[in-house]
Amino acid sequence: MPKPIKAPKAAAEHTLIALFEEEAAAVIAALKPAQAKFLTLKGFAGKAGSLIVLPEEGGCKAWLGLGARKTYTPMSFRALPSQLPKGRWALQYDAELDAHAIHVAWGLGAYSFTRYKSGSTPSEVKLDDTALDDATKTAVAREVRAHNLVRDLVNTPTNDMGPADIEAEA
């Protein structure tokens, strides 16, 4: 089993463990008996998109199935901002995975078109980024902002997109 990357626990309230089908049985066997039994009863086997969230003292612990290693895509993380309980999540994942791509996928999943909504708030489900270096954090933020700008422009009605409006967005 590949060596996992563990984010510092102090920065996050919750823990998300992402694993492949090939590793699921070994990871489940190493859990506390109650957790292992629950995951087994729920049929968790690391299938792509499968997610189990359990409350525990001081936060939650979640397991995300990434599917087979050969079919993995970082976009597996995209739906999580709308599926997980609010708070900051520390991610434990295979060290071979691209942290930049995972954080971009998470950021894309947190997108919401709020231009015409009053009182809208950003996603309250955050992925802890303390394990990323400053250059990676900057690159992730820039890429997510670019995607979100394009999505905002696509979602904006054409009658609100005169030349001055488009210039203001850019």
Descriptions of predicted regions:
Residues 1-169:
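Short amphipathic alpha-helical segment within the helicase RecA-like ATPase core
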